[in-house]
């Protein structure tokens, strides 16, 4: 009797044979001698067992698994053989250096193409600015074809192979990516794989009863099954879309976790996996370096559960990862999981998503500004920051999305804080419903049944710049100093670097007025960017401060990697941590001067050089930080 390993080996050899069966003997002989086949075959030998094991754990009893694999790997070979020589070189470079993303040189930016540059041709003209800022990674927010009007900001995709016509063409995107690569900038796009728009060809053909697309989505004849599922589902957008299902014109019901125009894909059908892997390979061959894996928590459904963070979801992502290791190993995955911190980290791994958003740190940065106390942030950095090797956090301050207060209730309780009550405070503080608040945020998706609410707003609005608070600029620089120095890949939400305010016009737009997140999705502010080199302006102070910190980070290997050790400052207002046993970082979250005592610093060297201030400071005496001051001290 064959062992499982032997069985997988036989399947692998069978599939390799089937890939080559379409060729004539002469063609086959040539292919088998080629460098392309040698590399592809080597990668299949390494990664097919992982792919097979993950898919078997999901589809093991499905008779379609083997024929699906046969078609998938034939497609993977075609995709790899058509991959450009330059991309194949990057494949090899990143196989040999999986820590490329952890370099101190890496600094990211993210923007909507239309809002920042008008279209793809306009974005290409902005590359010189991205280089000026120091970016090595650029995330282009959803730019694929989507419904006109409401499209969840582009997250309802009607075609993964067509760019939104208002932005340009696939050819334009290919040119932009090539130009970014020429400038030393990696290209990042969203891979929205939990759902498509209701206008996607697959959705239209599934709804029409096309047998080739049968069961591509969850469509039910009546409410019996949806009612059973809804009992345990969380409402994501309760204001505009209560429940998890939407009714079609013919009376049937379709699963729509997010919005009625976003239909959830049915991954219990293995052909859906194969179809989405094909879209992934298409994007990889455009030159995309990183895929932001959208809504990873939701892709598997199971009756009686929350349909979030299920084991099959992880297995499917690892299977997608294995496909990329075979067909386009240069491509990395970035997880987007805004869930409990215990679950966020489970999506990050070399075989799953190599990098992932750090929503806990983001939320706690704003929490610490509001409370002026670093206890929750210190706790998170101590116990939840360090990741497995070859993986990294994406550390951000703001994004296109709302702020959810994602700290764990049990973490808060350990510090004597009621999670529920503290979230209520934070919501009131950041929407200016709390005495003494400097913030001017906007509430998002208040749920009266649970009391849950999130917050919208740009960094400038939330930090107090809108009302010219004298500390607003320093607050913004402080938050970005943490993102730049805690380890991992820092990400700038473009516009933040010049203090762009909220766009109050969202309430007058019928396609946006029910979604306050549009408040922090403003257009490129030409006047503010024109001020970026003028230190007499807030825009200039923020920009020059961030640009200086980026330059320091990129010139100093002490910022390499992703791990840190927290340093107890014995001052509830000052956060402290050590990077690579060589850099001691301090940040004062108070509007008053704060001190780290000489006694607290007694294990440190007598003197240290402050990389931000450019001065030598004494550590054998009390060290005072001015309001919202940051210090990056070389201690070795």
Swiss-Prot record:
Lineage per the UniProt record: Bacteria, Pseudomonadati, Pseudomonadota, Betaproteobacteria, Neisseriales
GO CC terms in record: extracellular region
Catalysed reactions, semicolon-separated: [(1->4)-alpha-D-glucosyl](n) + sucrose = [(1->4)-alpha-D-glucosyl](n+1) + D-fructose
EC number assigned by the record: 2.4.1.4
UniProt site positions, description: Transition state stabilizer: 452
Source organism: Neisseria meningitidis
Location of the protein in the cell: Secreted
Cross-referenced CDD domains: AmyAc_Amylosucrase (cd11324)
A molecular function GO annotation: amylosucrase activity
Keyword Disulfide bond applies: no
Subunit and partners: Monomer.
Superkingdom of source: Bacteria
InterPro entries, sorted: Amylosucrase, Amylosucrase_C, Glyco_hydro_13_cat_dom, Glyco_hydro_b, Glycoside_hydrolase_SF, O16G_dom_2
Family: Belongs to the glycosyl hydrolase 13 family.
Entry function: Catalyzes the synthesis of alpha-glucan from sucrose. Catalyzes, in addition, sucrose hydrolysis, maltose and maltotriose synthesis by successive transfers of the glucosyl moiety of sucrose onto the released glucose, and finally turanose and trehalulose synthesis, these two sucrose isomers being obtained by glucosyl transfer onto fructose.
Gene Ontology BP term (one): carbohydrate metabolic process
The UniProt record lists the keyword ATP-binding: no
Pfam families associated with the record: Alpha-amylase, Amylosucrase_C-like
Main location: secreted
Residues bound to substrate: 152, 195, 262, 292, 400-401, 517
Name the UniProt record assigns to this protein: Amylosucrase
Keyword terms, alphabetized: Glycosyltransferase, Secreted, Transferase
Active-site residues (renumbered): 294 (nucleophile), 336 (proton donor)
């Amino acid at each position: 009797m064959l062992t499982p390993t032997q069985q997988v080996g036989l399947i692998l050899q069978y599939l390799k044979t089937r890939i080559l069966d379409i060729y004539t003997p002469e063609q086959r002989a040539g292919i088998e001698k080629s460098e392309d086949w040698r590399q592809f075959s080597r990668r299949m030998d390494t990664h097919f067992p992982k792919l097979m094991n993950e898919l078997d754990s999901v589809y093991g009893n499905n008779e379609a698994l083997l024929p699906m694999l046969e078609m998938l790997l034939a497609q993977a070979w075609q995709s790899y053989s058509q991959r450009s020589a330059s991309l194949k070189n990057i494949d090899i470079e990143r196989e040999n250096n999986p820590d490329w993303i952890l370099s101190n040189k890496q600094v990211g930016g993210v923007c909507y193409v239309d809002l920042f540059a008008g279209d793809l041709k306009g974005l290409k003209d902005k590359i010189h600015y991205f280089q000026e800022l120091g970016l090595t990674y650029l995330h282009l927010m959803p730019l694929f074809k989507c419904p006109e009007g409401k499209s969840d900001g582009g997250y309802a995709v009607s075609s993964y192979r067509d760019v939104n016509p208002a932005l340009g063409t696939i050819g334009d995107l290919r040119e932009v990516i090539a130009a970014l690569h020429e400038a030393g900038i990696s290209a990042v796009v969203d891979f929205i794989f939990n759902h498509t728009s209701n206008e996607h060809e697959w959705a239209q053909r599934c709804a029409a009863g096309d047998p080739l697309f049968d069961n591509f989505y969850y469509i039910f004849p009546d409410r019996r099954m949806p009612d059973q599922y809804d009992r345990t589902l969380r409402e994501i957008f309760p204001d505009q879309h209560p429940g998890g299902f939407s009714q079609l014109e013919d009376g049937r019901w379709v699963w729509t976790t997010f919005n009625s125009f976003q239909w959830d894909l049915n991954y219990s059908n293995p052909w859906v996996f194969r179809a989405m892997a094909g879209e992934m390979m298409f994007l990889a061959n455009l030159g995309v370096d990183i895929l932001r894996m959208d809504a990873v928590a939701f892709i598997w459904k199971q009756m009686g559960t929350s349909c979030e963070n299920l084991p099959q979801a992880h297995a499917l992502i690892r299977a997608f990862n294995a496909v990329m290791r075979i067909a386009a190993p240069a491509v990395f995955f970035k997880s987007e999981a805004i869930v409990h911190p215990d679950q966020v980290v489970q999506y990050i791994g070399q075989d799953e998503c190599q990098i992932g958003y750090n929503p806990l740190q983001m939320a706690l940065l704003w929490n610490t500004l509001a409370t002026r106390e670093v206890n929750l942030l210190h706790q998170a950095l101590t116990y939840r920051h360090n990741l497995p090797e070859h993986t990294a956090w994406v550390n951000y301050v703001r994004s296109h999305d709302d702020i959810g207060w994602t700290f764990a209730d049990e973490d808060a309780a350990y510090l004597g804080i009621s999670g529920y009550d503290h979230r209520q405070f934070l919501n009131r503080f950041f929407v200016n419903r709390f005495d003494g608040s400097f913030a001017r945020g906007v509430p998002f998706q208040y749920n009266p049944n649970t009391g849950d609410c999130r917050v919208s707003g740009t960094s400038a609005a939330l930090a107090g710049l809108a009302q010219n608070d004298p500390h607003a600029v320093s607050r913004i620089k402080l938050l970005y100093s943490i993102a730049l120095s805690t380890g991992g890949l820092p990400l700038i939400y473009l516009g933040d670097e010049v203090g762009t305010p909220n766009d109050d016009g969202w309430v007058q737009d019928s396609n946006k007025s029910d979604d306050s997140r549009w408040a922090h999705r403003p257009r490129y502010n030409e006047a503010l960017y024109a001020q970026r080199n003028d230190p007499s302006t807030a825009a200039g102070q923020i920009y020059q401060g961030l640009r200086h910190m980026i330059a320091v980070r990129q010139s100093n290997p002490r910022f390499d990697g992703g791990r840190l050790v927290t340093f107890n400052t014995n001052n509830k207002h000052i956060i402290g941590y050590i990077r690579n046993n060589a850099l001691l970082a301090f940040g004062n979250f108070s509007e008053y001067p704060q001190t780290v005592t000489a006694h607290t610093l007694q294990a440190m060297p007598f003197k240290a050089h402050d990389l931000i201030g450019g001065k030598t400071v004494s550590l054998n005496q009390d060290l005072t930080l001015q309001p919202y001051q940051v210090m990056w001290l070389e201690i070795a």
